[in-house]
């Protein structure tokens, strides 16, 4: 049957692709590798028995690379296996130290979004610091991507997270990436215009619907 992928379905719409950034990262990788795959959308509010049989803890995303292989969890591990099994075209980030660029943005973003007192707890400045670090990297290295003129795994990891950041902070907090961070803003435009991103992104309304319960709104 080839590659199969289990990813989150949209909140309230079990037949529509959901908002999980880690699931989108896997789909982006498969798309940019031009690999055929079958998608299973999993309603996390009503997980099917067959899914719980292969993932008792309900972990997503999951990938199976062949019919006689086991399902694999953890997006880092999955991306590594994809690169190992299907090395062309290469998505390896080089030099290796660039692979961690922007890695702290997701944590800072979630802390800021869920903060009850961001004006005083420093979560706003923590996020700004991480975005400024990304902006500095993009400004001082040839782009438009983190490691040069070609998209690599670090970009495919950052793209869904920056999409969540832009969508949720804009909707719930009327906040956006400062205009002074021109390199980050341009980088986001490039990422969001990728054909693979357009094909694998969740609609903004489903992303917002998924975050709302976590924010008590």
From Swiss-Prot:
Domain GST C-terminal: 86-217
EC numbers, comma separated: 2.5.1.18, 1.8.5.1
CDD domains: GST_C_DHAR, GST_N_family
Entry annotated with the keyword Oxidoreductase: yes
Alphabetical UniProt keywords: Cytoplasm, Detoxification, Oxidoreductase, Transferase
Primary localisation category: cytoplasm
Record GO biological process: ascorbate glutathione cycle; positive regulation of salicylic acid mediated signaling pathway
Binding-site list for L-ascorbate: 8, 19, 214
Catalytic activity reported: RX + glutathione = an S-substituted glutathione + a halide anion + H(+); L-dehydroascorbate + 2 glutathione = glutathione disulfide + L-ascorbate
Binding site for glutathione: 8, 19, 47, 75, 164, 211
Motif (Glutathione-binding): 20-25
Keyword Oxidoreductase: yes
Subcellular location: Cytoplasm, Cytosol
Recorded GO CC terms: cytosol
Protein name: Probable glutathione S-transferase DHAR4
Lineage: Eukaryota, Viridiplantae, Streptophyta, Embryophyta, Tracheophyta
Gene name linked to the record: DHAR4
């Amino acid at each position: 049957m080839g590659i199969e992928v289990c990813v989150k379905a949209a909140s309230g719409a079990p037949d529509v692709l959901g908002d999980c950034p880690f699931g989108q990262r896997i789909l982006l990788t498969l798309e940019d590798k031009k690999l055929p795959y079958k998608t299973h959308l999993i309603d996390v509010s009503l997980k099917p028995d067959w899914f719980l049989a292969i993932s008792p803890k309900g972990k997503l995303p999951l990938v199976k690379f062949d019919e006689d292989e086991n399902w694999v969890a953890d997006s880092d591990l999955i991306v590594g296996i994809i690169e190992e099994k299907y090395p062309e075209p290469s998505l390896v980030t080089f030099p290796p130290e660039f692979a961690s660029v922007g890695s702290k943005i997701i944590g800072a973003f979630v802390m800021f979004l869920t903060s009850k007192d961001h004006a005083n707890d420093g979560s706003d400045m923590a996020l700004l610091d991480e975005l400024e670090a990304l902006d500095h990297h993009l400004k001082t290295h040839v782009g438009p991507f983190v490691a040069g003129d070609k998209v690599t795994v670090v970009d495919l990891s950052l793209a869904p997270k920056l999409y969540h950041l832009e969508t949720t902070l804009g909707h719930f907090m009327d906040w956006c990436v400062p205009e002074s961070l021109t390199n980050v803003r341009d980088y986001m435009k490039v990422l969001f215009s990728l054909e693979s991103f357009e094909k694998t992104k969740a609609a903004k309304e489903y992303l917002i619907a998924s975050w709302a319960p976590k924010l008590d709104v």
